[in-house]
From Swiss-Prot:
PANTHER family in alphabetical order: LEUCINE-RESPONSIVE REGULATORY PROTEIN, TRANSCRIPTIONAL REGULATOR AZLB
Keyword Transcription regulation: yes
One annotated GO molecular function: sequence-specific DNA binding
Naturally occurring in which organism (per UniProt): Pseudomonas putida
Cellular component annotations (GO), alphabetically ordered: cytosol
Gene3D superfamilies: 3.30.70.920, Winged helix-like DNA-binding domain superfamily/Winged helix DNA-binding domain
Protein name: Bkd operon transcriptional regulator
Length: 161
């Protein structure tokens, strides 16, 4: 099993805060020279610890002001129904997150839209999907906390295989 030490955790925390940091700045922040720092980053990419680097956009600046949580219950929770629903949802760009849940509902979606009219069209689409039994939605009034950085133990950790 591969272990991540304090230095690896420091690298990951720095990259989670600013993925555009230069390797030289990153190396300085964890007290390494640039080459070993670069090698550690590459190793964590190869292990799948670092999946990708992205740019986070402002939904508000882009007019995506309607943040809705949608609870979806299916008629039957059988593999074929679940798979079909998940395939449909995966094609929708407004669906930011989708989780298969325990209990009721079967799925929880977070959808980001520009208007109530767009939400109405999306809900109309959902109601027409085969196997959908019930839909409930809740609007987010205010985002109290949002983060993308994962909580990592400062002392290091062992990776799962």
């Amino acid at each position: 099993m591969r272990k991540l030490d304090r230095t690896d955790i420091g690298i990951l925390n720095s990259l989670q805060e600013n993925a555009r940091i230069t390797n030289a700045e990153l190396a300085r922040s964890v007290n390494l020279s640039p080459t070993p720092c670069f090698n550690r980053v590459r190793a964590m990419e190869e292990l799948g610890v670092i999946r990708q680097q992205v740019t986070l956009l402002s939904p508000e600046a882009l007019g995506l002001d309607v943040n809705v949580f949608i609870h979806v219950s299916l008629e039957k929770q059988v593999e074929q129904s679940l798979h079909r629903f998940e395939e449909e949802i995966a094609e929708r760009p407004e669906v930011m997150e989708c989780y298969l849940m325990t209990g009721d509902p079967d799925y929880l979606l977070r959808v980001l839209l520009p208007s109530i009219q767009a939400l109405e069209r999306f809900l109309d689409y959902l109601t027409r999907l085969p196997g959908v039994a019930n839909i409930r939605s809740s609007f987010a009034l205010k985002q109290v906390r949002y983060k993308t950085a994962l909580p990592l133990p400062a002392n290091g950790m062992t990776l799962r295989e």
